[in-house]
């Protein structure tokens, strides 16, 4: 693990697994090795469209492939140095669909994941959802009826399970603001479809 993380140097050069080492070679261990190895990392990533939150699927790359030293935020003042060990067991705490963009939390720490997405998590997730009507709307009627708005707030089921109450409001004429405390697969898109709306953008 230390070799994979780049913490072992042979004559000043990072060692590789299986490398043969001469008896006279100078072996060094990065002094941060023990402290960094004990630390579990959490990464905040702005996921672009076209990446999946978790494992690769249907030819699309997982968002974790964007976690590199080169992509680190220039103004990040954290003293922790990036190494490949940070990618081990780095899992998303929540999900964003492949065609959604926004904040994705990746963590090695199960405690962080539980706080964010556990059944009793108090953390709310906010989304801006651009929508359009799936069917022609009669003149004088709104895309979303009062009954439809009430259903979005409370009273829907997905896959036979009732959804937790949500806060939904209009952000502008074609964009809804959703505040959720859970994250089922394609939840917002499916909720919108149930009230006759299609999603054209989600962040």
Predicted regions and their residues:
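Basic, flexible Lys/Arg- and Gly-enriched helix-loop patches that mediate nucleic-acid binding at interfaces
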Residues: 1-203
